A protein has these predicted regions:
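Active-site/acyl-donor-binding loops of N-acyltransferases
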Residues: 124-146, 255-311
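Conserved acetyl-CoA-binding loop-helix of GNAT-fold acetyltransferases
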Residues: 87-101, 237-240, 246-263, 281-286
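A conserved beta-strand-loop-helix scaffold within acyl/acetyltransferase catalytic domains
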Residues: 36-53, 70-75, 185-240
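Short amphipathic alpha-helix that is part of the acyltransferase structural core
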Residues: 1-43, 149-187, 309-311
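Hydrophobic adenine-recognition pocket in adenosine-nucleotide-binding enzymes
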Residues: 81, 238-240, 273
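Glycine-rich acetyl-CoA-binding "A-motif" of GNAT/NAT acetyltransferases
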Residues: 62-68, 216-220, 279
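Acyl-donor-binding surface of acyltransferase catalytic domains
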Residues: 1, 73-78, 83-158, 296-300
Length: 311
């Protein structure tokens, strides 16, 4: 049955085609508990920087039905199969079809480190290269004690914490690039990328906390995310100027961010961090965060002669 699968590019401006594409991802979220497409992938597909692919099968009973969805381009590949159609070989067939037109090295995420993704990766020449820990906090508190700690942390060593202001864009992007110089996604954000996120329905300037030194320079930030109707809040991105280390700024920002999420009515907080960032892992563990899930990034490297590389 898997050989009846077809790959095509849906028109996301068409309501029916867009619904079919995103319905596959929604079905996976309902079963797996996490989104198969991260935020950057969704922004890229809506902006046209990457291409959506829908995998459909044809049957006499249902005619053409979307059973898989992928987002490809810019050296990245994301693929998900509707849980109702897993275990039938569709994932392998879809991946072969996507790889047939791919050029150069590819990276792919397995959100939640799904066992089936490990098998597909192994069979198609992908090797694990990164692990992101998804951590979850204990119950958040807006109590006087917690608020007092965070407020005290807002004013130490000449550093103050306040919301993002209009005009901070260029300085923030420059600092973000330095903080995440070796980070494949976060470090390459542009002012346009920043503004695209600020245009999202969940954005509030008061959730974007900026640490400034006594001269008004940005030395760190904690951008928290409180999506409408969500119980969990998120430490969306937290960073401290590499030239401003060891002064407790990161901890102060994190406490202020957790306080802000509690003010927004969120009962817990989540965060994604690199598994090999031992100092960040230690800080979050000290503040009661525990591991919830793991995301694994795979890479498929192609040598100059077109053969797979295993190093």
């Amino acid at each position: 049955m898997s050989d009846s699968l077809r790959l095509s590019v849906p028109d996301l401006a068409d309501t029916e085609q867009a619904t079919g594409f995103f319905r596959v991802a929604d079905a996976a979220i309902d079963v797996d508990g996490y989104d198969p497409f991260n935020e950057q992938a969704r922004l890229d597909v809506h902006s046209g920087r990457r291409t959506p692919i829908v995998a459909t099968v044809w049957s006499e009973a249902e005619h053409s039905r979307p059973i898989g969805a992928a987002i490809v381009g810019r050296g990245e590949l994301d693929l998900v199969i509707d849980p109702l159609f897993r275990g039938k070989g569709y994932g392998s067939v879809a991946l072969r079809g996507l790889l047939a037109t791919a050029r150069g090295n590819l990276t792919a995420w397995s959100h939640g480190d799904h066992p089936a993704a490990r098998v597909l990766a192994d069979h198609h020449g992908f090797l694990p290269v990164r692990r992101l820990l998804q951590l979850r906090s204990g119950p958040l508190s807006a109590s006087a004690d917690a608020t007092g700690r965070a407020s005290h942390a807002r004013h130490r060593d000449g550093v103050t914490i306040e919301p993002f202001r209009d005009g901070d864009e260029d300085e923030w992007v420059e600092l973000n690039a330095r903080i995440f110089e070796s980070h494949p996604e976060q470090g390459r954000l542009t002012v346009d990328d920043l503004r695209a996120r600020q245009a999202e329905p969940w954005y509030e300037a008061k959730d974007f906390l900026i640490a400034r030194d006594q001269h008004g320079r940005i030395v760190g930030y904690d951008w928290v995310k409180a999506e409408p109707d969500a119980v969990d809040g998120e430490i969306y991105v937290l960073g401290v100027d590499p030239a401003h280390p060891g002064r407790g700024t990161g901890r102060a920002l994190l406490l202020a961010g957790l306080e802000r999420l509690a003010e927004r009515g969120r009962t817990t907080a989540t965060v994604s961090i690199e598994a090999d960032d031992s100092s960040a892992v230690r800080l979050y563990h000290q503040l009661g965060f525990t591991e919830h899930t793991v995301d694994v990034q795979y890479r498929r490297r192609i040598d100059s002669d077109g053969a797979f590389s295993t190093h």
